[in-house]
Every structure is written in structure tokens, then in C-alpha cells.
């Protein structure tokens, strides 16, 4: 039985898979809903992904899977906090699927499922992401559905 910490969050978003993919991968979008953080990469497997906040690199990770516009996975290792530096990278995966469980009259709907896993048992990062992901994903959803993100600061 696997007892490692794992975070799973699903939400429905009134958008298309392509628009959601763009929001996850375009720094012009990520800075709007991720507290000013730009995610920069060419989004190819094995490539570097850099998280930049206020001009500083706060993550330097690797793309593990990239299947536009359906699946994105990368390593996750925060660099901005001393207490996290000794912890090995974890893994975050974004699965995007068209949702057909409700009427399509309002337009396309996708289901986004974020899975964040591969944490050590005594992870200091895990409790932080459990608080952070709901904020980020709620802001992403709001941006895609209304055109304006929820503003917050780290």
C-alpha cells in the first residue's frame, strides 16, 4: 500500500482544451493567475521549465510529459525557500479532458485534474502545495471564465 503524500484536485472549467493548454503554458497567462509568476519553457519532454517571480528564478524544473492539449507533467522543486532545498523534486501532472456530463448549451467544458505526487514522507513542500494549488487553480478558472484572474500575492 502506497502511503506517500499525494495531492489531487479536479475542477470543471468553461473553456476548450486548447485555451486551457495555452493558459498553462503561456507566460502572459501564468503571470495573471499565478501571483505574477511566469512559467517559461519550450514545453518539450526533457526541456527545462523555469518559474520566474519578480525577476528571480524560483523553480528550475524539467518537462516530464507533454501531449498538447491533453497532458502536461513536470518536476517541481521550489528554490525560493531554504527549508525546501534539501527535499528532492516532486512531480505535478495536469490532465485535461473534455467534459460531457452536463449540457453543452453554455459552450465547451473541460475537466482539469492536477495530481502532485512523489513527495517524501516527511515533506515540508507538501503542506504548502495543499494550500497553494487551490488558490492558483481557482484563479486560473476565474481568468478563463471571466477574463480576470483572482489577485493574490505570495
Regions found by a protein language model. Name each.
Residues 41-80:
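Glycine-rich portal/gate segments that line the openings of hydrophobic small-molecule binding cavities
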Residues 20-21, 30, 49, 63, ...:
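Hydrophobic pocket/interface hotspot
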Residues 33, 139, 143-146:
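Amphipathic, soluble alpha-helical interaction motifs
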Residues 4-10, 48, 58, 71, ...:
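Intrinsic-disorder/low-complexity, polar/charged segments enriched in Ser/Thr/Lys/Arg/Asp/Glu/Gln
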Residues 4, 33-34, 42-44, 56, ...:
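Short solvent-exposed loop/turn micro-motifs enriched in small/polar/acidic residues
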Residues 8-14, 50-52, 62, 95:
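Generic structural detector for well-ordered beta-strands
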Residues 1-40:
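Hydrophobic ligand-binding cavity/cleft-lining segments
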Residues 81-134, 140, 151-154:
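Beta-strand/loop substructures that line and gate deep hydrophobic ligand-binding cavities in soluble
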Amino acid at each position: 500500500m502506497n502511503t506517500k503524500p499525494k495531492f489531487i484536485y479536479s475542477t470543471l472549467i468553461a473553456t476548450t482544451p486548447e485555451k486551457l493548454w495555452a493558459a498553462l503554458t503561456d507566460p502572459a497567462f501564468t503571470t495573471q493567475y499565478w501571483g505574477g509568476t511566469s512559467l517559461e519553457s519550450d514545453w518539450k519532454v526533457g526541456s527545462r521549465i523555469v518559474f520566474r517571480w519578480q525577476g528571480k528564478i524560483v523553480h528550475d524544473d524539467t518537462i516530464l510529459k507533454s501531449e498538447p492539449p491533453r497532458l502536461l507533467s513536470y518536476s517541481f522543486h521550489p528554490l525560493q525557500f531554504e527549508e525546501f532545498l534539501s527535499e528532492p523534486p516532486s512531480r505535478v501532472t495536469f490532465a485535461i479532458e473534455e467534459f460531457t456530463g452536463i449540457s453543452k448549451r453554455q459552450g465547451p467544458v473541460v475537466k482539469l485534474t492536477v495530481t502532485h505526487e512523489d513527495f517524501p514522507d516527511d515533506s515540508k513542500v507538501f503542506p504548502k502545495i495543499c494550500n497553494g494549488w487551490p488558490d492558483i487553480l481557482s484563479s486560473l478558472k476565474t481568468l478563463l471564465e471571466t477574463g480576470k484572474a483572482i489577485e493574490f500575492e505570495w
